[in-house]
Amino acid sequence: MPMEDMLEMLKSCCRRGLERLYPAGVPPAAMRRYRHELELVERAGTAEEYLLFREISKAAERAFSKIYVPNSVQGTMLVYLLGDHDLNPLSAHYYCTACGYYTEPKGAAVGLDLPPADCPHCGKPLRRDGFSLRRQWSDSAVEMGAFSYWFSNGFYPTGCRVIEQHYRKRGRRAVPSACWRDSADRYESHGMVVLPRGRTMDTMPETLKIRDEFGGLCIDVTDLDKVPVPLSLRRTELLDRMEALQRESGILFSELPVILSTRTLLQDMLATDIPDKEQRALLRRQKPATIGAIMDCLTACCNLYERPGGGNIRHDSLYEKLQWDEQFARSFAEYPVYSREALYALLRREGCCRERAFELTESIRRGWWCFDPEQREQWLPKKLLWQCARIVYLSGRAPGCWRGLQYLRMAQYLHLVPQTFYRVMWGV
């Protein structure tokens, strides 16, 4: 299919998504974000990747399953419109589905933290939405269109078939791939790889053919420079557990009630024992009072910090840093930088212009903080210097927001059907 036709198809799908999500009129903020991202896709020629995402998302919806896209593309308007209706990237806002009223109140990063309200024009209950996912960190991902997918074990074969059929219609083959894992001392399934037009598994060089942990014939993608277009696919236990709860309880994800009180949800979420040790420890330590704060804590658990004297191999998680580094703990207590968005906002409050704040945030969050002390002290509070000088990687908010939503869903299952939850999770 010519690129122009794929782009028109993408526009058509997005327009239907906008009409479905905003039935009383599309807010200007949503239209601006959509048009901006569409221009990036048109310039980069990556429309096909978004159409494939839509096909996979629709297949998951038909199977009453969910998928997760773990990189920065998760926080884009295009992904939200094309099938993943979890993370609206706009600022926290109210929207009236009856008359189209739209407003972005101050003081909340996540729309679910806004108090219930009625439309001042027509009196109908307002929809609360938005996760404040800045486009500064998603623009490059939009242009690359580099999707990775997390599936449940049950949906994994279906997802692979959708990918295979998508490329077969375009005269190309998508075949299984595997990657060498030093930690396991073996090849492990990596997902799929899209072969050049006219090539099949039989015509690929024998040096690239290996067997994965299941014994299946795969293309070796350990050296990405030697193979074309790998698609990273991963199985995740979290989605397996969610599907089991949905199946055993008879309550679909889409049928779960409106979010309950934050206090109840946090207690139930910790009681599920689904968050890992570090996530539970940080949640108990910080005692988040809002849904947005819960999500920020989960985002912070994705961050990496340098261990002084440990070389480039050994990195600490936030939990580990807080355990042994007293100076870091004091800095974090006063300036709890959970995510790149949080650091960007702090720099803006300290007087940085937008361009300078983004430049510094990118340098710090990638572990490239190599400015001299005088330069650092010019832009950062002194108690933040220790913290920022040792950041190896600082995550965006999207992963924590997505994971937080799934944990909150599971907490609602525990709250609504506790016996089913205990039976599915722990067999009791």
Model-assigned labels for residue ranges:
Residues 1-428:
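Noncatalytic, beta-rich nucleic-acid-contacting surfaces in large DNA/RNA-processing enzymes
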